[in-house]
Amino acid sequence: MKAAEIREKFLKFFESKGHTIVRSSSLVPGNDPTLLFTNSGMVQFKDVFLGAESRPYSRATTAQRSVRAGGKHNDLENVGYTARHHTFFEMLGNFSFGDYFKRDAIHYAWELLTGVYQLPKDKLWVTVYHEDDEAHDIWAKEVGVPVERIIRIGDNKGARYASDNFWQMADVGPCGPCSEIFYDHGPDVWGGPPGSPEEDGDRYIEIWNLVFMQFSRDAQGNMTPLPKQCVDTGMGLERIAAVLQHVHSNYEIDLFQALIKAAGRETGVSDLTNNSLKVIADHIRACSFLIVDGVIPGNEGRGYVLRRIVRRAIRHGYKLGKKGSFFHRMVADLVAQMGDAYPELKEAEQRVTDVLRQEEERFFETIEHGMSILESALADLEAKGGKTLDGELAFKLHDTYGFPLDLTADVCREREVTVDEAAFDEAMARQREQARAAGKFKMAQGLEYSGAKTTFHGYEEIVFDDAKVIALYVDGASVKEVRDGRQAVVVLDHTPFYAESGGQVGDQGVLANASVRFAVSDTLKVQADVVGHHGTLEQGTLKVGDVVKAEIDAVRRARTARNHSATHLMHKALREVLGSHVQQKGSLVDADKTRFDFAHNAPMTDEQIRRVEEIVNAEVLANAPGIVRVMPFDEAVKGGAMALFGEKYGDEVRVLDLGFSRELCGGTHVHRTGDIGLFKIVMEGGVAAGIRRVEAITGDNAVRFVQDLDARINAAAAVLKAQPSELTQRITQVQDQVKSLEKELSALKSKMASSQGDELAGQAIEVGGVHVLAATLEGADVKTLRETVDKLKDKLKSAAIVLASVEGGKVSLIAGVTADASKKVKAGELVNFVAQQVGGKGGGRPDMAQAGGTEPANLPAALAGVKGWVEGQL
């Protein structure tokens, strides 16, 4: 049974049991800032399990794309060298949110494994938590698993409830026992059952984990039964495929074999058991899907992990003798294997290929540069008879140039040199400590809230007359009242205030009644459906239970809406002008502007910017209505709605049709495109490799910008005594005149310098047969100084000359030495002798050198010392 069929049968089986098939979420978690990557099926349901989010179903099943590389869950170094470690894997799962519990979960698992997949019952073993009699009895008395194949696992990790068979989301919160299902490969494979001394062998392989969220654990370790008991299960597709395809390594399944063959083809290696081919096959999956989900190779966070995986794959190709780009060509092979299951991969194929190709080219330049540094260091080491490469140098190669330690070690090994890995590790530890202190991925600081949700009315209304205060916070702590002058967060049962989300800033405004006035400076989400109004109480005392009138700043909201709607039109226009590879990578929409980051590999041309402006303003002039519909996510995407990579969407989504644009969006927008008024791009630039940024303005801001620009053009035209329409022509004429005058001035300076040069020749002093001259040439530029030095060298025959000029508080110096004298007197040393005394430095050839300085007051003394310096050289 092929992997694709196994995946499909799993999802269809649970669909037949009343489960909703939920698409895989992004590898970039949308609801958990503590995670680098989605690493299990339950991540997208975390808020559901915590009660902070509701879904329209109580049963779900998924095939979740997952990555474990970087952070707490990091399998990277084991990948390719063990049978079951991967950076990327698919987790098949079924979930119950307060619906069924242990009995159904266990029966479903058994039915799928033995009925649908037809695994022999006598090959299956199970484990349960040692206190979970309920699960034990279901397995033994209802399913019929012999008790000798049901193993109770106790607290085997050194503390109460610290067990392989007891799951907990965190130190506090939902937790519960779990039951794992193992497959027995038979006595021909070494290993013992779980819980035995030989459990690390390969005979008994865990294939499925059933987690029963049964309790809530408090800070003191007390367990309280959850009001809604939940189920979270996970079965690795690669592991179950290995079992069903009768192989002992995940790399032998059909999906991996196709990719390993592709790696062999690209590297010219015929031995398909080579571990480096396994590494490459694994890494093409992780890299491609991370790029699909919007991650770009970079130097920090997720981008750094992606870059590390890409470079590890390239390095293994390099070890196999592949000295040029190859990795990006495997994207097509991956699409052939997984494109049907994940259409987003197929759609992004060209973009993924381009990103990987660019990263490869960049890294091969790194390898060449790193090899040059390493070869030089090894040559020095060999000359000294050393046999150990400095670990600090190895770390510098790794940290500064991206040169992997194992590649450094491989090169050294060929020279019978070892790397001081202890020093390398010490340097690495210092860097990790610095990174840890920087805390790139810290737990989001939130407010503890367990009350009612906030009903949002802001799409239709800007005022809500009877909003009830249901919670108050001061300095992060819940309070019953807030007094005049205090900053606080107010939670209402109803609000027209939009909470910051999707790049759009939160509303500002006022909460008030007859005795209270609270100025709202920002609006943020406390939870998915709970809105916090942040601000200052300007009058009265505000209490929980008070009723207030909630009114937003309507002018600010209207300006923000114009900018947000313009962003949608601009996104569509950018895709038309630059190509369908353009994907949003970030945005900020406020009352002043829209800032939009997108994937594109080159600066936009003036013509492309102009074309985008034309397209957007044509949509504005069309004055098309904005139409909002709520529908299932899959229906929206099938209907052409653009979903943004990395955004978290529910199963019901809000679709905005605005002119020629159709996007999923929960923000606030104009009623018609004409409300935008005018659209103008004011900035375009790069923010990272492969990421461009555009800033644009709309409405009255755009009108003021154009008026200001018009005023500046008129002022410039007046200065040049031209009509605004003739400004370009007039500027060209002025530039031509300036060039002509500069040419005349240069000729005059040269002529003047030549005449001064004739006079200066008579000032030369002969020292040891060499004419020495050090003088200032008034009004001369560097070019004139150089020409004069050349003429003086011809005239004086054997000479050492320094000429200087001063302009704008800066010193220019030229030194010239004739060929016969340059064996002893070097022009570079001569010019530096003078430059150091006038606050500068310089250099050049033995016969001609240039320098500058910033201390002209010291110039006379410096020139006076030239004769003695030259005399010392002779």
From Swiss-Prot:
Catalytic activity: tRNA(Ala) + L-alanine + ATP = L-alanyl-tRNA(Ala) + AMP + diphosphate
GO cellular component term of the entry, any: cytosol
EC class: ligase
Listed InterPro entries: aa-tRNA-synth_II/BPL/LPL, Ala-tRNA-lgiase_IIc, Ala-tRNA-ligase_IIc_anticod-bd, Ala-tRNA-synth_IIc_core, Ala-tRNA-synth_IIc_N, Ala-tRNA_ligase, Ala_tRNA_ligase_euk/bac, DHHA1_dom
BP terms from Gene Ontology: alanyl-tRNA aminoacylation; negative regulation of DNA-templated transcription
Keywords: Aminoacyl-tRNA synthetase, ATP-binding, Cytoplasm, Ligase, Metal-binding, Nucleotide-binding, Protein biosynthesis, RNA-binding, tRNA-binding, Zinc
PANTHER family per UniProt: ALANINE--TRNA LIGASE, CYTOPLASMIC (PTHR11777:SF9), ALANYL-TRNA SYNTHETASE (PTHR11777)
Domain topic, free-text comment: Consists of three domains; the N-terminal catalytic domain, the editing domain and the C-terminal C-Ala domain. The editing domain removes incorrectly charged amino acids, while the C-Ala domain, along with tRNA(Ala), serves as a bridge to cooperatively bring together the editing and aminoacylation centers thus stimulating deacylation of misacylated tRNAs.
Family statement drawn from the similarity comment of this UniProt entry: Belongs to the class-II aminoacyl-tRNA synthetase family.
Function summary: Catalyzes the attachment of alanine to tRNA(Ala) in a two-step reaction: alanine is first activated by ATP to form Ala-AMP and then transferred to the acceptor end of tRNA(Ala). Also edits incorrectly charged Ser-tRNA(Ala) and Gly-tRNA(Ala) via its editing domain.
Stored NCBIfam families: alaS
Protein name per the record: Alanine--tRNA ligase
Species in which this protein is naturally found: Paraburkholderia phytofirmans (strain DSM 17436 / LMG 22146 / PsJN) (Burkholderia phytofirmans)
Upper classification of the organism: Bacteria, Pseudomonadati, Pseudomonadota, Betaproteobacteria, Burkholderiales
